[in-house]
């Protein structure tokens, strides 16, 4: 118990007991909407024994989680989502694979960051460099014209805002710096260790004080009618004492592991912790965390234990009357919380994109580093770093599915029904795949021939190639 630092959080937890009972009573005659999200401190190099093991873990997640989602979709009519908070010190070589996760709809990518001994200046400099690398794969960018830096955050070693007695951070104004760089909020807590805040089971705002550490130790609750309050947004997961745990009472800290998986008694406790925006108690947020890259915990995240957890969630908390279950990403949870602040009610899934639009790679996936100029449902523009490198781009813009070629610039405009490649290499070849039922009215700058599966084979003759669709 002492190693879980109950001295820091238990007084607040006990003081919330009456509120928890009161809010459950208020929800008895209405539908409780359960917003369920898993935030993964995703570290594929952790305790890797072989050189190729991190890449294998990343690929196993793509396959295994896709299989779990298919099973859940078939069994329950909807599928879970995952939020991978990826740390740069585990390698930029995995960013394309993570962008695939996002493009394929498995979930979304956010930032996990370990550091130590930083100053405000060094943290700004280092984070900007990290963000530039992620942006070159379309990650941590909000879709739009132009795309904007935008990310959720989990601090390494739980030490947000220098909260670990000077270790694993060093910066007292970290909340301010994160906001400056495009961070919409933090999802680090709970930790149930020395970094744990006195504030528990809350969605709230902390005002940064650069003169002292741990400014997020307390703050103002998010509440209906108080839109866009001052401070930095934080969303916590459930923390408390689970008296129904098998064998003996346990500390519930919202962590998913193979040993401590999503058992029915834990699921009930997550809801009982009652994390919500004040004034909207019927929208209950269940934010869990895990260190999911390591093989030992895969069963609890996309194996049989995971499926049993989702079976319990759907059987007990998705009857459509007393409860409705909504699987959300971290970004979507933030948007729904902001919608509650603005007074919205009813179906929270209507507000998944309320404040922050989907991530940029919702609409495209490029196989090479690039600078993204625009990413919307109807248009994608980018410049590749190395025009001599053959680049494959998958698309969700109407009319176009995929292209592969050597080029410097790409502009896919579904409104104008055109795909433009600039800086092409004459004499090279390329390929463009069109949507079913769509045909090319003209191709300028390249000879072309039709192939199977709605594809055009290109023999490039000019530096500029334009494919125009027929009406």
Regions found by a protein language model. Give the residues of each.
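Active-site beta->alpha N-cap acidic-glycine motif
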Residues: 1-107, 115, 149-151, 157, ...
């Amino acid at each position: 118990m002492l190693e879980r630092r109950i001295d820091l959080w238990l007084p607040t937890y006990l003081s919330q007991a009456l509120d928890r009972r009161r809010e459950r009573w208020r929800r008895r005659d209405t539908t409780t909407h359960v917003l369920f999200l898993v935030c993964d401190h995703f570290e594929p190099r952790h305790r890797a024994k072989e050189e190729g093991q991190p890449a294998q873990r990343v690929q196993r997640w793509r396959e295994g989680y896709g299989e779990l989602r298919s099973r859940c979709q078939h069994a329950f009519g909807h599928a879970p989502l995952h939020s991978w908070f990826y740390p740069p010190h585990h390698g930029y070589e995995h960013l394309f694979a993570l962008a695939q996760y996002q493009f394929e709809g498995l979930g979304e990518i956010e930032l996990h960051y370990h550091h130590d001994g930083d100053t405000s200046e060094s943290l700004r400099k280092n984070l900007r460099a990290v963000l530039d690398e992620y942006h070159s794969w379309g990650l941590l960018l909000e879709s739009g014209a132009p795309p904007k830096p935008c990310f959720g955050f989990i601090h390494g070693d739980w030490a947000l805002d220098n909260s670990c007695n000077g270790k694993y951070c060093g910066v007292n104004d970290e909340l301010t710096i994160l906001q400056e760089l495009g961070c919409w909020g933090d999802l680090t807590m709970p930790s149930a260790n020395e970094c744990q805040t006195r504030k528990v089971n809350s969605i709230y705002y902390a005002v940064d004080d650069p003169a002292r550490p741990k400014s997020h130790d307390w703050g103002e609750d998010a509440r209906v009618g108080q839109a866009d309050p001052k401070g930095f947004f934080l969303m916590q997961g459930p923390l408390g004492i689970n008296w129904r745990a098998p064998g003996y009472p346990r500390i519930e800290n919202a962590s998913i592991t193979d040993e401590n998986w999503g058992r029915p008694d834990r699921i009930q406790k997550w809801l009982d912790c009652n994390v919500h925006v004040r004034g909207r108690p019927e929208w209950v947020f269940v934010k869990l965390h895990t260190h999911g890259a390591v093989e030992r915990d895969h069963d609890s995240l996309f194996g049989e234990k995971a499926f049993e957890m989702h079976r319990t969630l759907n059987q007990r908390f998705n009857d459509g009357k007393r409860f409705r279950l909504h699987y959300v990403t971290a970004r979507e949870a933030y948007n729904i919380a902001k919608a509650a602040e603005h007074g919205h009610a009813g179906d929270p899934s209507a507000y998944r994109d309320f404040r922050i639009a989907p991530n940029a790679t919702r609409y495209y996936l490029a196989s090479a580093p690039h600078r993204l100029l625009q990413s919307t449902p109807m248009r994608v523009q980018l410049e590749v770093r190395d025009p001599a490198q053959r680049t494959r781009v998958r698309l969700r813009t109407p009319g176009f599915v995929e292209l592969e070629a050597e080029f410097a610039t790409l502009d896919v405009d579904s409104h104008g029904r055109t795909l433009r490649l600039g800086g092409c290499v004459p004499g090279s070849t390329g390929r463009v795949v069109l949507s079913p039922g769509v045909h090319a009215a003209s191709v300028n700058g390249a000879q072309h021939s039709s192939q199977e599966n709605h594809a055009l084979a290109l023999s490039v003759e000019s530096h500029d190639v334009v494919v125009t669709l027929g009406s």
